[in-house]
């Protein structure tokens, strides 16, 4: 299990010196595009660690709600991010020694996380934590919404996944239940918030591998990404 504490992370900016030494695959995309499932499968295929940065924003949201913090108070929420201790593995998440794996995927956190994710101070704290995690882990598959554009712009490979809102809603329903039309509306709202926020909005990097997963299996997508990584690494050794 990987301990991530925003109190003692290395404040090292991203750059070629770090990313060129490490195998980093950045996977970005909107909610429900298959990022988590594909990123986890890819990490297993490549035998490197996996980091879910979306879970980090959810953990901050949970902690802020727990403490009764006004989510519009940027300084207060950022202070929560700095103070909290988190333990993360591939499938379990702990905040201050409490297992929040299921809680952070619940409706309350899901409805509020886009507010927290739009706060620049919070994003700065978590970016530093993400860079430190990857440096300590020796690389990894990192998924989120600004990984290839901001956190690791010089990643080995940058991937942007998407799918139609209807398909993304169906996937969420199959995972967690709920009304498909209501979830599709939530997804569309989240897309708008993510793509229009002032700090690192969701967008495709110019040099990313774009994959529409609407009609593709997980295995097919993982195979395509792994093949691209192999091609890049092979050409770099020629």
Question: Each predicted region: which residue ranges?
Answer:
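Extreme N-terminal, non-catalytic leader segments
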Residues: 1-24
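Hydrophobic anchor at the beta1->P-loop junction of P-loop NTPases
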Residues: 27
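P-loop (Walker A) phosphate-binding loop of NTP-binding proteins
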Residues: 30
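Conserved lysine of the Walker
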Residues: 35
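Hydrophobic positions on the alpha1 helix immediately C-terminal to the Walker A/P-loop
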Residues: 38
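N-terminal phosphate/diphosphate-binding loop that engages ATP/GTP or pyrophosphate donors
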Residues: 41-107
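Small-molecule kinase domains that catalyze NTP-dependent phosphoryl transfer to phosphate-bearing small molecules
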Residues: 90-91, 130-138, 147-150, 154, ...
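ATP-dependent NMP and nucleoside kinases share a basic, alpha-helical "lid"
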Residues: 101-176
């Amino acid at each position: 299990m990987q301990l991530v504490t925003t109190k003692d992370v290395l404040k090292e900016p991203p750059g070629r010196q770090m990313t060129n030494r490490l195998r980093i695959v950045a996977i970005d995309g909107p909610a429900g595009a298959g990022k988590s499932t594909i990123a986890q499968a890819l990490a297993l295929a490549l035998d490197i660690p996996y980091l879910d940065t979306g879970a980090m924003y959810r953990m901050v949201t949970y902690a802020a709600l727990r403490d009764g913090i006004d989510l519009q108070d940027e300084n207060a929420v950022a202070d929560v991010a700095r103070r909290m201790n988190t333990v993360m593995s591939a499938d379990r998440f702990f905040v201050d020694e409490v297992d929040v794996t299921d809680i952070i995927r619940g409706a309350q956190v899901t409805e509020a996380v886009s507010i927290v994710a739009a706060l620049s101070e919070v994003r700065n704290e978590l970016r530093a934590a993400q860079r430190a995690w990857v440096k300590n882990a020796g690389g990894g598959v990192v998924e989120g919404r600004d990984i290839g554009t901001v956190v690791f712009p010089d990643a080995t490979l940058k991937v942007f996944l998407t799918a139609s809102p209807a398909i993304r809603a169906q996937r969420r329903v199959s995972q967690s239940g709920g009304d498909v039309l209501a979830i599709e509306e939530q997804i569309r709202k989240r897309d708008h918030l993510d793509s229009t926020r002032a700090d690192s909005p969701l967008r495709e990097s110019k040099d990313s591998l774009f994959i529409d997963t609407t009609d593709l299996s997980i295995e097919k997508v993982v195979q395509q990404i792994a093949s691209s990584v192999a091609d890049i690494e092979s050409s770099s050794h020629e």
